[in-house]
Structures are given as structure tokens and as C-alpha cells.
Regions:
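FIC/Doc superfamily catalytic core
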Residues: 1-145
Length: 145
């Protein structure tokens, strides 16, 4: 299995799209962000995966994908406080992150489902971390840095 570093070295899972294929994937990504009535968590997961797969930038595609997840979850009311830190999860389970991204890039229904499940786990872990931090702040035990 591959680690998170391998995903970053290759800048994404699967074959890197070029030219018209890249333009089409990016257009689809923009449309997906604005689709109404789509399940918010599924939309956020697919947007993240598409940033990894399309990789429009020379670096930072994974970070942009994780940022978009946080933005979409807040915008769509899934986690309106913005305190969930789901973007920490990939660093905690880098192999699972790389494997889930690879599964998505396979293009199979099973791969897409595996990715969405992974993203849901990341959101849950982020909510749990936010709760832990909020409790520490309330108890006066949280220290910066």
C-alpha cells in the first residue's frame, strides 16, 4: 500500500488528466459545487476527490480539496460552526487516505463509495476533535501552541 507522501509525489491518484479532459473535469467540478439538492456530504467528498484526481495546480491540490470540504460543509449546513477539523484525518491515516483516493480514481462504483465512506469518517473524526477542543476551552485546560 502507498502512503500519503506517494499521493503528493504523484500529485494525485490515477492518470493525470491533460488538455480537454482536464478542462472538462474542472467544469464538472465547478458545476458540482453549485448543484442544488445534492447530498452535502457526498458533494463535498466528490469535490475533494476530484481535486485530487484532476490536480489543476502544480502543488497543493490535496490541501485545496480538504479546504473545499470544510467550506462546503459549513456552507451547506452540515457543520455550520466550522469547528470540525476533518482535514487533520488524512495525516492521521495517510495510507487509508491514499488507498481511498486510489479507489475513487479507479472509477468504479465501489471505489467511489469507498471514498465517500472515507470522507464521512474524516468528518466524524473532525467533529470529535472539535468537541474535544471545545470541552478543553470550556474547562480552561486548553493551551495554544
Amino acid at each position: 500500500s502507498r502512503g500519503l507522501g506517494d499521493v503528493y509525489k504523484r500529485q494525485g491518484p490515477g492518470t493525470e488528466p491533460q488538455g480537454e479532459e482536464l478542462a472538462a473535469r474542472l467544469a464538472g467540478l465547478v458545476e458540482l459545487i453549485e448543484v442544488e439538492r445534492a447530498p452535502a456530504l457526498v458533494r463535498a467528498a466528490i469535490v475533494h476527490a476530484e481535486m485530487l484526481a484532476a490536480r489543476p495546480f502544480t502543488a497543493g491540490n490535496a490541501a485545496v480539496g480538504r479546504l473545499l470540504v470544510r467550506h462546503l460543509l459549513v456552507r451547506d449546513g452540515v457543520e455550520p460552526t466550522g469547528t470540525a477539523v476533518s482535514d487533520l484525518y488524512p495525516g492521521r491515516v495517510p495510507v487509508a487516505y491514499a488507498e481511498a483516493a486510489g479507489a475513487y480514481a479507479s472509477g468504479t462504483m465501489e471505489g467511489v463509495v469507498a471514498w465517500v465512506v472515507w470522507q464521512a469518517e474524516a468528518v466524524l473524526a473532525g467533529v470529535q476533535e472539535a468537541q474535544r477542543l471545545c470541552r478543553a476551552v470550556q474547562a480552561g485546560t486548553w493551551r495554544a501552541g
